[in-house]
């Protein structure tokens, strides 16, 4: 299975076998991610982090992943301090950064920017999130979390919150379809899963249900994947105010849940998960954030060819 010099742009570029290989690699590297073992797999390698959108977990976990493997991370810093503010286009930026680093991690607000960057890069490009469409490394870590805390095959999962603009759930739908998941989409009518995604899933014979009620489905699912309503994706602030607090996971709601239910969230959260949930055995979102480190370690090591 060849991963060396491969770009990581969309989950649709990966087969189930390839996804499983990434997850297996992450599991082998997890002791290094936890600081229990040391590794020099990326000794002498430089990873450039080009983030044109705010990020905490994705950026820091890529930095941690690079350093845990003995590599060095070059951080662009603020966009305001870069040549982009002088009018340099993304293609030229990518061409130049390719000369400085062995791999580029890109986060950008425009749909398709990572795919375009890969065309101009002379080193592997990993998509750290572009526009509202793709966020493959988040999906890999979501799959890894589900595999570690529950199971992937024939999973019963509900995705709730902002399903219209949420790139994490869009990527996750495709990936879980490879494992025969049964999916329930919970959202206000204004934030439903895009109809083309629902159609694609149904064509693959995936069972799909849509509702606006968490209470209706909480006892029937094994994983609940919550998302925040993203203020920055709303052109109209009034529309955001109408929907921001419609769905919330509380201790009372979880009384009706399966005892083995796991609650995931890509973070940051706002009001959609009450703090009281944090202390329950259902809460997996902080461990989920940690799992981003071994997953990104695996993707870095595979793309740079230091592990097979």
From Swiss-Prot:
Pathway: Pyrimidine metabolism; UMP biosynthesis via de novo pathway; (S)-dihydroorotate from bicarbonate: step 2/3. Heterooligomer of catalytic and regulatory chains. GO terms for biological process: 'de novo' pyrimidine nucleobase biosynthetic process; 'de novo' UMP biosynthetic process; amino acid metabolic process. This is Aspartate carbamoyltransferase catalytic subunit. Catalyzes the condensation of carbamoyl phosphate and aspartate to form carbamoyl aspartate and inorganic phosphate, the committed step in the de novo pyrimidine nucleotide biosynthesis pathway. PANTHER family: ASPARTATE CARBAMOYLTRANSFERASE (PTHR45753:SF6), ORNITHINE CARBAMOYLTRANSFERASE, MITOCHONDRIAL (PTHR45753). The lineage of its organism: Archaea, Methanobacteriati, Methanobacteriota, Stenosarchaea group, Methanomicrobia. Belongs to the aspartate/ornithine carbamoyltransferase superfamily. ATCase family. It is an enzyme of class 2 (transferase). L-aspartate binds at residues 86, 167, 228. Keywords: Pyrimidine biosynthesis, Transferase. InterPro entries: Asp/Orn_carbamoyltranf_P-bd, Asp/Orn_carbamoylTrfase, Asp/Orn_carbamoylTrfase_sf, Asp_carbamoyltransf, Asp_carbamoyltransf_Asp/Orn-bd. Its EC number is 2.1.3.2. It comes from Methanosarcina acetivorans (strain ATCC 35395 / DSM 2834 / JCM 12185 / C2A). One of its GO terms (molecular function) is amino acid binding. It catalyses: carbamoyl phosphate + L-aspartate = N-carbamoyl-L-aspartate + phosphate + H(+). Carbamoyl phosphate binds at residues 57-58, 107, 135, 138, 267-268.
């Amino acid at each position: 299975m060849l991963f060396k010099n491969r770009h990581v742009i969309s989950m649709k570029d990966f087969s189930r076998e390839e996804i499983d290989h990434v997850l297996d690699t992450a599991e082998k590297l997890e002791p290094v991610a936890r600081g229990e073992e040391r590794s020099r797999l990326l000794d002498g390698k430089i990873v450039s982090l080009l983030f044109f959108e705010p990020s905490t977990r994705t950026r820091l976990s890529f930095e941690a992943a690079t350093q845990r493997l003995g590599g060095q991370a070059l951080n662009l810093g603020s966009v305001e301090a870069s040549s982009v503010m002088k009018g340099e286009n993304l293609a030229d930026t990518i061409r130049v950064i390719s000369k400085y680093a062995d791999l580029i991690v890109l986060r950008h607000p425009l749909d398709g920017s990572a795919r375009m960057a890969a065309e101009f890069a002379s080193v592997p490009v990993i998509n750290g999130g572009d526009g509202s469409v793709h966020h493959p490394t988040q999906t890999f870590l979501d799959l890894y979390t589900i595999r570690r805390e529950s199971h992937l095959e024939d999973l019963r999962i509900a995705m709730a919150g902002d399903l219209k603009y949420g790139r994490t759930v869009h990527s996750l739908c495709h990936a879980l379809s490879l494992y025969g998941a049964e999916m329930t989409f919970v959202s206000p009518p204004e934030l439903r899963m895009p109809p083309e995604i629902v159609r694609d899933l149904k064509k693959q014979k995936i069972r799909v249900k849509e509702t606006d009620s968490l209470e209706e489905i909480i006892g029937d699912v094994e994983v609940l994947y919550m998302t925040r309503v993203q203020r920055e994706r709303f052109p109209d602030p009034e529309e955001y105010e109408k929907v921001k607090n419609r769905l919330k996971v509380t201790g009372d709601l979880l009384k009706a849940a399966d005892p083995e239910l796991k609650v995931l969230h890509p973070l940051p959260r706002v009001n959609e998960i009450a703090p009281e949930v944090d202390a329950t055995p259902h809460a997996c979102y902080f461990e989920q954030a940690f799992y981003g480190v071994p997953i990104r370690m695996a993707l870095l090591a595979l793309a740079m060819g230091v592990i097979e």
